């Protein structure tokens, strides 16, 4: 229903950067990278329906972390954000503290931090 509302108000075609240069990158909703590795090419772009991106929307009465989480290519955005240096200066905070999780991500981040 959300895409129907957006489509009724604005006629927009979404383009998503695709290719090896986007793997492991943090990309905002407009397709621009927000990590510290700089710009990437669009590789011709692709329609959202042709990519393997899943957007999950939550209700407004849920916590912000639950609403904003989505999975892209099998990687949790919150885990990727936890690896980025100086992310709090950009005003972006991970939905889950990766150092509190009991996983391989926790071990990797603790080694990276020290």
UniProtKB/Swiss-Prot annotation:
Keywords: Allergen, ATP synthesis, ATP-binding, CF(1), Hydrogen ion transport, Ion transport, Membrane, Mitochondrion, Mitochondrion inner membrane, Nucleotide-binding, Translocase, Transport. GO terms for cellular component: mitochondrial inner membrane; proton-transporting ATP synthase complex. InterPro entries: ATPase_a/bsu_AS (IPR020003), P-loop_NTPase (IPR027417). One of its GO terms (molecular function) is ATP binding. It is found in: Mitochondrion; Mitochondrion inner membrane. It catalyses: ATP + H2O + 4 H(+)(in) = ADP + phosphate + 5 H(+)(out). SUPFAM superfamilies: P-loop containing nucleoside triphosphate hydrolases. It is an enzyme of class 7 (translocase). Its EC number is 7.1.2.2. ATP binds at residues 44-51. Its main location: mitochondrion. The keyword Transport applies. One of its GO terms (biological process) is proton transmembrane transport. The keyword Translocase applies. Mitochondrial membrane ATP synthase (F(1)F(0) ATP synthase or Complex V) produces ATP from ADP in the presence of a proton gradient across the membrane which is generated by electron transport complexes of the respiratory chain. F-type ATPases consist of two structural domains, F(1) - containing the extramembraneous catalytic core, and F(0) - containing the membrane proton channel, linked together by a central stalk and a peripheral stalk. During catalysis, ATP synthesis in the catalytic domain of F(1) is coupled via a rotary mechanism of the central stalk subunits to proton translocation. F-type ATPases have 2 components, CF(1) - the catalytic core - and CF(0) - the membrane proton channel. CF(1) has five subunits: alpha(3), beta(3), gamma(1), delta(1), epsilon(1). CF(0) has three main subunits: a, b and c. Belongs to the ATPase alpha/beta chains family. This is ATP synthase subunit beta, mitochondrial.
């Amino acid at each position: 229903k959300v895409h129907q509302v957006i489509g009724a108000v604005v006629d927009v075609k979404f383009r998503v950067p695709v290719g090896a240069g986007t793997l492991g990158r943090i990309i905002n909703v407009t397709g621009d990278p927000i990590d510290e590795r700089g710009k990437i090419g669009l590789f011709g772009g692709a329609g959202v329906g042709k990519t393997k991106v899943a957007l999950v929307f939550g209700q407004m009465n849920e916590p912000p972390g639950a609403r904003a989480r989505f999975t892209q290519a099998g990687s949790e955005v919150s885990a990727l954000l936890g690896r980025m240096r100086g992310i709090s200066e950009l005003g972006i905070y991970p939905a889950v503290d990766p150092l509190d999780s009991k996983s391989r991500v926790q071990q990797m981040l603790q080694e990276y931090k020290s």
